[in-house]
Design a protein with these regions (language model features):
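Residue(s) in the substrate-gating loop at a strand-loop-helix junction
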Residues: 151
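Short C-terminal tail/terminal secondary-structure segment
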Residues: 2-6, 156, 233-235, 246-248, ...
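Alpha-helical segment proximal to the catalytic Tyr-Lys
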Residues: 132, 180-184, 255
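Substrate-binding pocket helix/loop in short-chain dehydrogenase/reductase
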Residues: 103-104, 108-113, 227
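Canonical Rossmann dinucleotide-binding motif of NAD(H)/NADP(H)-dependent dehydrogenases/reductases
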Residues: 9-39
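Active-site helix of classical SDR
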Residues: 127, 167, 175
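Short, small/polar-rich loop/turn modules that mediate ligand/substrate recognition or access, typified
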Residues: 183, 188-190, 257-259
Length: 271
């Protein structure tokens, strides 16, 4: 096997949550380009099926299933469908998430709980059922890699993101707990987190709008300039930047990496 082959995922199977757009979609594309069969999942079925059709039209091997990550029975079904269609499960990308931008004193408890339910409970449930399938004796039983999407907000304090930052910090530590447990039990399952800075997606558009409303700057361009300056490299990231990191952590090239926090943030976390 060549060094280049270490980055391939031929014969492997992945499940990606929140895959109808943005980072999740780009992760699904990157994994299929590496030779992986991918089950895309999301709440937005029309968009999810459309992008799955696009991936297949481009030569990929992908399917789509509905998944509300807060519902345990839907995780069970999604993994059963993945196993039935593709014959295994080697990679889980826990990408689905939501964000609320608000001052602490204006954040409703119900909204805080909603963010935690999607961003933390969803990752917990995905890890739980993926590990059950991937571990020795499981329905897949050949080990694998779990990649959890956290954020720069899971490593650094950021104003107006008390709910989101708390949830992403929890994802960071849950990742380490899963990594250590799987390693000590000899499951052959690695678990790592990816921490993007600001990436230009539909979620980022809302992020900028909400910060403008909070008076961070008078214009959207001013808000963007303020956040762009937080990245020492001087520009925002792309979904491809994040997807390439996920592909690396999913591949044999990262075989001795588990419990790690991979920052994809133009240097923000290094400040």
């Amino acid at each position: 096997m060549s060094d280049r082959d270490d980055f391939r995922l031929d014969g492997r199977v992945a499940l990606v949550s929140g895959a109808a757009s943005g980072i999740g979609l780009e992760c699904a594309r990157a994994l299929t380009l590496a030779g992986c069969s991918v089950m895309l999942s999301d709440l937005r079925d029309t968009e999810g099926q459309a992008v799955t059709d696009d991936i297949n039209a481009a030569g990929g091997n992908a399917a789509y299933t509905h998944l509300d990550v807060t519902q345990e029975d839907q995780w069970v079904r999604a993994i059963v469908e993945t196993l039935a269609l593709f014959g295994g499960l080697d990679v889980l990308v826990n990408n689905a998430g939501i964000e609320i931008v608000a001052p602490l004193v204006d954040t409703l408890h119900a909204d805080f709980r909603k963010v935690m339910c999607v961003n933390v409970d969803g990752v917990f449930l995905g890890c739980k059922h993926a590990v059950s399938a991937m571990r020795p004796g499981g329905k897949a039983g050949r080990g694998g890699s779990i990649v959890n999407l956290s954020s720069i907000a899971g490593k650094r304090g950021v104003s107006f993101l008390s709910a989101y930052g708390t949830s992403k910090g929890a994802v960071k530590l849950l990742t380490k707990d899963v990594a250590i447990e799987c390693a000590q039990l000899g499951y052959g399952i690695r678990c790592n987190s990816v921490h993007p800075g600001v990436v230009l997606t539909g979620m980022a558009d809302g992020f900028f709008e909400q910060h403008k409303a909070l008076g961070v700057a008078d214009t959207i361009q001013g808000v963007q300039a303020a956040f762009e300056a937080a990245h020492p490299m001087g520009h925002f990231g792309t979904t491809r930047d994040v997807a390439n990191a996920v592909r690396f952590l999913a591949s044999p090239a990262s075989a001795w990496i588990t419990g790690a926090e991979l920052s994809v943030d133009g240097g923000w976390a290094a400040r």
